[in-house]
Amino acid sequence: MSEYTVTGTFQARDGWQSFETEIEAPNENVAEEHTLAEFGSQHGLKRTQIEIEGVDA
């Protein structure tokens, strides 16, 4: 499995806030899904409130 750096923004109470996180996943699509699931569970966000801008290996 490779390590991917996922960047993007999410909707916070005071506007959109940027983020950068590192995820270990077999491919880029799985890294995106893990990021959406992680932010959704940690911050109580829906997928429409998270915008992923890029996934880099």
From Swiss-Prot:
The keyword GTP-binding appears for this protein: no
Xref: InterPro entries: Ribosomal_eL20, Ribosomal_eL20_dom
A GO term for molecular function: structural constituent of ribosome
GO cellular component: ribonucleoprotein complex; ribosome
A matching Pfam family: Ribosomal_L18A
Claim: Amino-acid biosynthesis is one of the keywords in the record: no
Keywords linked to the UniProt accession: Ribonucleoprotein, Ribosomal protein, RNA-binding, rRNA-binding
A Gene Ontology BP annotation from the UniProt entry: translation
Family under the similarity heading: Belongs to the eukaryotic ribosomal protein eL20 family.
Subunit and interaction comment: Part of the 50S ribosomal subunit. Binds 23S rRNA.
Protein name per UniProt: Large ribosomal subunit protein eL20
Organism: Halorhabdus utahensis (strain DSM 12940 / JCM 11049 / AX-2)
